Amino acid sequence: MKKIISTLLASCCLTSLIAQEVVVKGPDEKLQLVVSASPAEKPSYSITYNGKTMLEKSPLGMNTNIGDFAKGMKLTGHAVTPIDTVYHQDRIKTSKVHYQANELICNFENPKGQKIDVVFRVSNHDVAFR
C-alpha cells in the first residue's frame, strides 16, 4: 500500500515538471504550430509543413519593465477558434479575399503570478503571433 501511494505521489510531482504542448493546424491541416512550455525552459514554438520542419524550436517570451515573461512561464490555458472571413480590398488584383485560419490563444503565467496572453493565427500558408 505504501509503495502504491509513493508511486502516485512521485508521478504527480513529475507531471508538473513535464513540458506542456499545444498543437494547432491550419484549415487544410498541412501547416502545424506547436507551442510548448516547461518550468525548466523558456516557452517555445515550432512550425512544420507536411511534416517538414520550417522553423525549429524557437524561444517565446519577453522581459519588460512590468515583469519577466521569458523564464519559468507556465501554460495555464489555451483556446482554439476557427476564423472564416471575407473582405474586400480595392488596390490589389484579387479584390475579394477569403481568409481562413485557426486562432490559438495561449495563457501564460510567470513565477510572480503575472499573466500574459499570446495570440497565434495559423492559416494554410502563414503563421503570425502577437
List the model feature ranges, each with a label.
Residues M1-E21:
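Bacterial Sec-dependent N-terminal signal peptides
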Residues N50-N110:
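A low-complexity, Ser/Thr/Gly/Pro-enriched, surface-exposed linker/loop concept
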Residues Q20-S58, V122-D126:
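Beta-strand-rich N-terminal accessory domains
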Residues K3, Q20-V24, T64, V97, ...:
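Hydrophobic transmembrane signal anchors and adjacent membrane-proximal interface regions, especially
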Residues V35-S38, V97, A101-R130:
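Acidic, contiguous internal or C-terminal segments within carbohydrate-active enzymes
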Residues I5, S11, T81-T85, F129:
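Short, basic/low-complexity N-terminal boundary segments at the transition from targeting/disordered tails
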Residues E29-L31, D90-R91, Q114-D117:
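Short alpha-helical segments and helix-capping/turn motifs at coil-helix boundaries
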